[in-house]
Amino acid sequence: PEATEKKIVRSALETDDAWFNSGDLMRTVDVGFTLGYPHYQFVDRVGDTFRWKSENVSTNEVGEIINGFGQIKFCNVYGVEIPGTDGRAGMAAVTLQDGVAELDVDAFSTFLRSELPAYAVPLFVRIQPDIDVTGTFKMVKGDLRKQAYDIRSFDDTVYALLPGSDRYAAFDLAMLEKIEAREAGF
């Protein structure tokens, strides 16, 4: 009973409402023929974790925080390897809300650093036009993990939170080469 109660969010949107946090990530979609009733689509099952700086990081918890930033439509959080470090650093692939042309990097940096512990703030953010999903609408993480922050393998914009900085900066080939040479200071 106590564990179940922890999964129930009360008064989330209205007084006395209740929501059971099942661990499934859903989204509302317009399928065009529901006669005004909402249609929900399964997006992902939450619960993935990775270790960074000797801490366990929940991709679900980080993703929920990122989704709380007004410019973000969807995000997919995963861990990526950095040569010469233990564990995996956080990386988030995000899509921007309709009508948002460019991520406000300063506001996003401030938001994440105020909402997450330092070890959980993703070191890399990849801006994608769409989030890839499987036939069962599960977010695809495998290819993203393999590509990581190697901007030679895709055309998306990447921002990095560099060591000693409190703000994301545009990621370029010079920084990629420093990481590969283990000279970036992570």
Show the residue positions of the predicted features.
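AMP-binding/adenylate-forming catalytic core of the ANL superfamily
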Residues: 3-120, 130, 135-139, 143
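AMP-binding/adenylate-forming catalytic domain of the ANL superfamily
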Residues: 116-139, 156-181
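Long, low-complexity intrinsically disordered regulatory regions
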Residues: 185-186
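A short, polar/charged loop-to-alpha-helix boundary motif
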Residues: 147-159
